[in-house]
Amino acid sequence: MEFIPALQARIDEHKPSLFELLSEQQLAALLPPTVRYLLTVLTQRYPRYLLRVLNSFDELYALAALVVERHYLRTRGGSFTEHFYGLKRERALAAEIPRASAAAPGAVRDALRLRPADVWRNLLVIVGVPYLKRKLDEAHEADAPRAMMGAAYNRPPLPGAPWRERVAFWWRCFLRRVYPAVNAAYYLSILAFNLAYLFDNSKYHSPFLCLIGTRVRRMSAADYRAIEALEERAAKRRGGRSVAARMLGGLSLVLPTSIFALKFLEWWYASDFAKQLSRKAAESLDLPPPVVAGLPTGAGGGGGSEKAQQPRREKELGKEKDEEVEEEEEEVSEEEKERRAIERAPVSASSLLPIYTVPPPENSDQCPICEGEITTAAACQTGIVYCYPCIHKWLTGTHPRQEKFMAERAGKWESGEGRCAVTGRRVLGGTEGLRRIMV
């Protein structure tokens, strides 16, 4: 399929193949996540300075891409990644002019080069459309869990609700019902134009380029001569503007260098040579002999008896403290136990009352509520597994353990209804938020 364009009746040497265009699009799509990953790594070291930048990454990246792409469209005639593949953009004609292109390539280039209005239209396609697509995808993914919670979390606003609630409701309706169809139409239109371009039935490989009347072509000798002349004129000028132009032009060298470094690191960490070096480095380490607690001097291989017996003494002291705490808890009154339970319990943000919870089980096979072996396992949204009847009754507030506890504490405690029995966190969707586990 790579040679299909060359098998057509009319051969156009300046028309790029579909696979060149797809490679360029893949490279352009890899830049945002790569920059985001590098920024995330740096933010972990310098969160004070870079946390706000990371939170506003999409907007700042779109602004930086707008500056870089505008410079490359004005000086190179193509986007940043298109220039890396030797491609350019030009205004599309109703008919081809092969004779004029062969006789006067410089004049044809000047006649078809992008005008200022064309540059802004292409910036809208290169920067604006991907930014809008990323935002819509993120909003759709964020709304997907809410759509699965049931009708209780998707109710329409009341008649007297503020306009923000009404707008948010209709926005969620758009993301849930309309956007999947729009997303499918987006990819289907791109696929249709790609197939039409592959079989030489269209001069555009993208519907957006068709809308703005721009097509992608291979760079000719006239384009390279024009770029060299432009760089020579920029080198003669002095000032901050020429320095900025040189820095933006130097990005074309940074991209292939970074790709080479990335591929080299990928090969290095996947090769056996790197594993052998790391293994040899680990073998050369001279580790001290271990110190075993409870052995006399010299038996541990390096530590004295005092150091060896220190962990045992600490354990014995810890056991004595635990026994003292248990004896004190047995001696305290019921009021003191109630006060300590209130201090340990989570507090509701709305009622400011302590929430009744149960301790986590020592064994993962036990249900925290009934303290027996789990039957008909069900997972809560907090990740804790219960018996399905136990957690279902707990969320509805009808479990016997809840009723017994709340018999004398009504108005002083929250029963834990609608919350996780161990953590006390609110379970979205109530019983609909439970997930049965099939083993």
From Swiss-Prot:
Pathway: Protein modification; protein ubiquitination
Region (Disordered): 292-343
Organism classification: Eukaryota, Fungi, Dikarya, Ascomycota, Pezizomycotina
Membrane topology: Multi-pass membrane protein
Protein residues bound to Zn(2+): C367, C370, C387, C390
Keyword list, A-Z: Membrane, Metal-binding, Peroxisome, Protein transport, Transmembrane, Transmembrane helix, Transport, Ubl conjugation pathway, Zinc, Zinc-finger
SUPFAM superfamilies linked to this entry: RING/U-box
Protein name (database record): Peroxisome assembly protein 12
InterPro entries in alphabetical order: PEX12, Pex_N
